[in-house]
Amino acid sequence: LAPAATTAAADWANRTYADPTAGGASVTLINGSATVGTDRVDLTDTLPATFRGEPAAVVVLTRTPGNGGPATQFVELFRFDAATPVPLGVKAVPLDPGATATKWSVEPGAILRTATLPGAPDVVSRYGVKADGSLA
């Protein structure tokens, strides 16, 4: 995995994604969001990348519980078969309820999440990418 300047075009706001919190279920976004029970799922970010030298993308969704509690982000890595996104790996990561901002980025071999907390240093979480594209 490596960062890239641009990513292949895809309709990220209107597609079906894996939901790693629901035992293999999926969630379908329409215009960038979906309602699952009382929860809301939103497209948060898309990051251009390359995987094994080919175009790829990292997509981040945020699931906000309707009954309160901390949100969870799903980070998913896609490669492309021609112009079609093919999912490789997905991971669910809880959001720190005290974070005022979250920024995702791609570095060689990993996806990074930087959380900004008031009065504290930023917290950086690193999610490694295995050879098959799954996330560690």
Listing of model-derived features with the role each one plays in the protein:
Residues 1-25, 98-136:
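Acidic, small-residue rich beta-repeat scaffolds with periodic aromatic anchors
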Residues 86-94, 136:
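Beta-propeller fold detector
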